[in-house]
């Protein structure tokens, strides 16, 4: 490849999303010796920009010139699908929704033994256009080895963790040997080891002819071989240029609107903003009722095992969460963290075949599911996927009083006051009246936290709560979690990031391949 010639040029584009214009008259050029990272706050337009590159959103004006295209074409046309690989949370969400629909069809047709495997998903991009060739099989083996995902090829896609599905989709994009690979938040949902492995894989990919665009929220995830950085703010291209010129404390502070310190390390960058004292929450404003009736033991699991055929997801788990304790669960992808959450929430039916006690009642003993859920607030990627109804963010928050997907009754004046209180605490008033489905991933996460808390739950489950959040919203949500830690609500906090464990956490459980490595008081485990 001839170095330093144009690879892709965004010429004065403007994008219309619903009734708003974004990226007005934006110009951006990628040259053939460059790899770019894109940074910006939640809802700033990062994903809109990269979606425009493959035709995911239409252009209002301007054009995109695909200098890398393998065939001559008109500038306004999109290259062949094989030439651009794209991975994002929205793509992952679409895949899981499609698989859930397929599972319903199989159950209706009595074909419950059929599954969609990770291998099927990886090859699906090719099968959409043509049959598989020996060259495809050879490339498949190389990609799978490159990403280290041999172990999950025959697993059902529905049984994989968020991080495992993400790696499967990256393999799906790579098997087509694209000229341009767009990775929108590829590290979200991955454990520490998987993040390091994927970063190494992306760095190796950058040594070949393929160019990479990496959209990230965490500066630590900008891999070493990135050469240039584009900053996006409030729907506009804010700053762009060589990595070392753009990534300074001053520029990043201007991007996010508060003082940040950027430090260079041998692995890239680290950003810090100092510690903050968390205020106390006025429970008289945002709590609907007293939590005096909470039993001594909130959760208890005895010899709990979850198994799919020969795959053991949880292996004889013994664990309890008592009154006054706030727990964090750590573990690698596929270790069983999310399975524990699903057992508690009633989303995994194997809970009824095990000794799982919630608030003093054993699952399967005649308890009413909605009565149990009334005591639990939850924030997770799975819950975020379920909210597909077109409704305002305010109504999504209000639906938390009724544990419903959708709002089917009018809230009382007292309930409205509580909703308004959480909106004020989370500082989400600017998005609370917007259509929920039009919000960015990170903005939706903030709405779901408010939804989880409005019913004053004795237990709040947070499965990767910082997933998809920029540094400003991560700081805000961690501060709010610390504040919640000082209320009657107890926390079950699931994360892949040890550095995001709040100070209010009192106990930690570490999992590996479905087994408990250690559990106990935080100071003894970490």
PLM feature spans:
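ABC ATPase nucleotide-binding domain signature region
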Residues: 50-127, 342-405
